[in-house]
Amino acid sequence: MLFLHTLQHFTVDGICGAVLAAYAVNESYFEPIAYYFGLYNLIAFGSQWLIGYLLDRKFNLIGHAFLVSLITLALGTISELGILCQTILLGIGNSLFHVAGGSLVLRKYKTYKELGIFVSSGAIGLALGLNLLCNAIVFLLFYAAITLIVFYRLRRGHVDIEVQSESRDNKYVGFPLIAMLGCIILLLGCVVLRGFGGGNSVSDYVMLFPCVFAAGKVLGGICCDKIGYKNTIILIFLLSFLSLQWKGLIPIVILTLAFNMTMPLTLRLVHFCNPNYPGMMFGLAAGCLLPGAFFHNDFSVIPQAMVVIQFLTLFIAGWLFKTYNQRQVVL
C-alpha cells in the first residue's frame, strides 16, 4: 500500500500542477495567476487539519475520501467550469488525498522511512505538471486506476490498520500537557522555516531540485530509523552548516537536501505528540507551509540564521520529547 500511496501522491500533485500551469500560460497578467495559485495553496494546505480531524473521528470514511478526491480532481481538469471553480475543486481534492494518505501511513507504520517515501513523490509530480512535461489527463488516468485499487483493498479489509480510540480524559502519564504543546509548537515552527527555505528551486534546473526535495525526504526518514532522530537532527545541522561555507550549485543542493530531511522527522514526532489524531496532526504540519507560500518574498533571514533557528527548534523539541516520552496514553 505504501507504493500505491506514493504513486497517488505523485499523480495528485501532477494533476494540480498541470491544470494550473495550463491556465497560467494563457493568462496575460501576473495578478490573476498569483491569486489563483494562492487560493489553491490556501485550500489545499489550509483545510487539511479540519479534514484530518473529521477523518480521525470517522475513520471508516477514509476510503470514501479517496473517491471524493478522485471526483473533485477529475472535475478540476474541466476548463469549461472556469478557473475559479477548477482551483477550488483542485484544492479540495488535493487536501482530501493528502490527509487520507498521510493518516493511513502514520497509522500503519511506526518508523520514519515510510513517511519520507510517501511525501517524496509529490515534488516530482508537481514539477512535471507545472512545467507541462506531462498532461493532466495522463496523471488523472493513473490516479483513477490506483485509487480504485486502494479503495477496493480498504473495503475488503486487505490493509491492516491500527485504529486508536480517542482518549476521553486526554491524560498523558509522564508527558505534561505544557511539554506536549511546547514540542508541537517547536516542531511546527520548524515546518514554517522549511516552507521558506526548503522548497525553492533554481529555474535553470526544473527537475534537479524537485528530485533533491524527494531525495532529502527519503534520506531523512532512513537516517531517523538508522541513527535515531536525535543524531539525525545533528546531521541535518552539520550538512546545512557545511553547505554555507562555499558557493555554487553543489552547496545549494546540499542545503536543500538538508532542509527537506526534516520533513519525515517533524511529521512523525508531531504525530507521536497526539497519536489519536494522525490526520489532524498531518494537516497541521501541512498548513504550516502556508507562510512560506505567501510571504517568501517579504521574509528575509540570512541562511546562517535560518539554519541555527531550525537546529534550535528541532533540538529543543527533541529534548522535550526524549525527556517526556515515557508516557502512556490513557485510552
Regions found by a protein language model. Name each.
Residues 1-41, 186-201, 297:
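Helix-loop boundary and gating motifs at the non-cytosolic
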Residues 16-21, 171-217:
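Extracytoplasmic gate region of multi-pass secondary transporters
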Residues 34-56, 208-219:
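Central cavity-lining transmembrane alpha-helices of secondary-active solute carriers
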Residues 62-78, 231-246:
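Structural signature of the two symmetry-related core transmembrane helices
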Residues 95-110, 260-275:
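Intracellular juxtamembrane helix-capping segments at the cytosolic ends
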Residues 137-156, 304-324:
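Symmetry-related core transmembrane helices of the 12-TM Major Facilitator Superfamily/SLC fold
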Residues 230-266:
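C-terminal transmembrane helical hairpin of 12-TM major facilitator-type secondary transporters
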Residues 275-310:
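A late C-terminal transmembrane helix in Major Facilitator Superfamily
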